[in-house]
């Protein structure tokens, strides 16, 4: 998923880019769930729990994460999310799907004695609008820093 929205672009007329978020979109519950999903996915990634990761990702993203987990082998991983903030950047909809871009910033610490490290990344999540029970699924991660 290489398509990423322009976060701070401006037009030739000099007007600032305004993200497209539908007026009826429930931003606060979405952000609350996005933060929870970030933390749960981090824990599932640390433990290599592909079943739990599958619940939060598209099949393509699951394949990428699975390959990363296999690459690290038996090396244990413990990441503490020390602080997280999230901002909804954009929501694009078609007749049958929606894609939302969420910018996560905060601090992570590897292990129990690692130094806190800042992170800044954009997650692209998608939802099947034809299925009333569909969840938002992680489709891509864009590192910004």
What feature does the model see in each segment?
Residues 68-76, 88-91, 124-128:
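Intrinsically disordered, low-complexity boundary segments flanking structured domains
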């Amino acid at each position: 998923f290489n398509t990423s929205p322009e976060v701070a672009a401006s037009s030739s007329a000099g007007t600032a880019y305004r993200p497209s978020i539908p007026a009826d979109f429930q931003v606060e519950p979405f952000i609350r769930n996005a933060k929870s999903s970030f933390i749960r996915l981090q824990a599932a990634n640390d433990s290599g729990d592909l079943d739990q990761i599958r619940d939060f990702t598209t099949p393509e993203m699951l394949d990428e994460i699975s390959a990363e987990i296999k690459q690290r082998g038996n090396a244990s991983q413990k990441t503490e999310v020390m602080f997280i903030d999230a901002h909804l950047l954009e929501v694009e909809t078609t007749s049958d799907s929606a894609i939302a871009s969420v910018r996560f910033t905060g601090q992570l610490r590897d292990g129990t004695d690692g130094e806190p490290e800042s992170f800044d990344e954009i997650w692209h999540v998608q939802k099947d609008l034809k299925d009333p029970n569909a969840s938002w699924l992680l489709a891509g991660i864009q590192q910004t820093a």
